[in-house]
A protein has these predicted regions:
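Amphipathic beta-strand/beta-sheet edge segments enriched in Tyr/Trp
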Residues: 74-127
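Solvent-exposed, polar/charged alpha-helical surfaces in well-ordered, non-transmembrane soluble domains
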Residues: 48, 52-56, 131, 135
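Residue-level preference for beta-strand/loop junctions
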Residues: 5, 93-95, 164
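Sec-dependent N-terminal signal peptides
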Residues: 4-16
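C-terminal/domain-edge helix-coil "capping" segments
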Residues: 111-175
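Short beta-strand->alpha-helix linker/helix-N-cap micro-motif
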Residues: 33-37, 56, 60-77
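A structural "domain/chain start" motif
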Residues: 18-52, 150-175
Length: 175
C-alpha cells in the first residue's frame, strides 16, 4: 500500500513538473512546405530537381513537413537574364538565371521574405544549362537561413497581431 501511494505521489509530482516546463515557441511550430506553381516558368525537367533543392533547404532548417497542406510555402520564380551561344568549337550555351525564393502565406497572400540568387552557367544545350543553374543552388547557403528566420519572425508577428485584434473585438461584445 505504501508503494502504491508513493508511486501515486511520484506520478503527480512528475505530471506537475512537466506542466511547468515552457512550451515551444510559435516560431518552432511553423511548417513551411516547398511548392512549384503549375504556371511556373521553370522547365519541366528542372522542376523535380528544384523541388528537391527546396525540400533540402527547408530540411536543413528543420521546418519541412511531408504533407502537401500547409498555410506557409517556399516557392521560387526564375528569370533568364541573359542567354547566348559562344563562338567557340564546340559551341556552348551560356545563360544567366535569377532565382527568387519567396516564403508566403497562401491563405492571406502575404509575402514574408524573399531572396534573389543569380547563377551564370555554360553547357551544351539550354536544358543542360538550366539544370546546371539549379544544381548551383547551395542548400547550405547561409542566406537561406537568414531568409527563413526572417520569415518565421514576421509570421509570428502577424499571427500575434491577429490574435490581439480578435481579443479586442471579443472584448467589445462582452456583456
Amino acid at each position: 500500500m505504501k508503494r502504491f501511494f508513493l508511486s501515486l505521489v511520484v506520478l503527480c509530482i512528475a505530471t506537475l513538473a512537466s506542466a511547468q516546463l515552457p512550451t515551444d515557441s510559435l516560431a518552432e511550430k511553423i511548417i513551411i512546405i516547398p511548392h512549384i506553381a503549375i504556371t511556373s516558368d521553370i522547365p519541366e525537367p528542372a522542376q523535380n530537381l528544384m523541388m528537391d533543392r527546396m525540400k533540402r533547404i527547408l530540411l536543413k532548417n528543420g521546418i519541412v513537413d511531408t504533407s502537401d497542406r500547409s498555410r506557409f510555402v517556399l516557392t521560387v520564380k526564375s528569370n533568364i537574364i541573359n542567354e547566348e551561344w559562344t563562338e567557340t568549337v564546340p559551341p556552348k550555351y551560356v545563360m544567366t538565371v535569377e532565382f527568387t525564393f519567396y516564403i508566403g502565406d497562401v491563405e492571406s497572400g502575404i509575402l514574408y521574405a524573399d531572396k534573389l540568387f543569380r547563377r551564370k552557367v555554360a553547357s551544351d544545350s539550354p536544358e543542360k544549362a538550366y539544370m546546371q543553374a539549379v544544381n548551383a543552388i547551395r542548400v547550405s547557403d547561409p542566406e537561406f537561413k537568414i531568409m527563413i528566420d526572417k520569415a518565421k519572425q514576421r509570421i509570428v508577428e502577424t499571427l500575434d497581431a491577429r490574435e490581439e485584434k480578435l481579443i479586442i473585438e471579443g472584448n467589445e461584445y462582452d456583456i
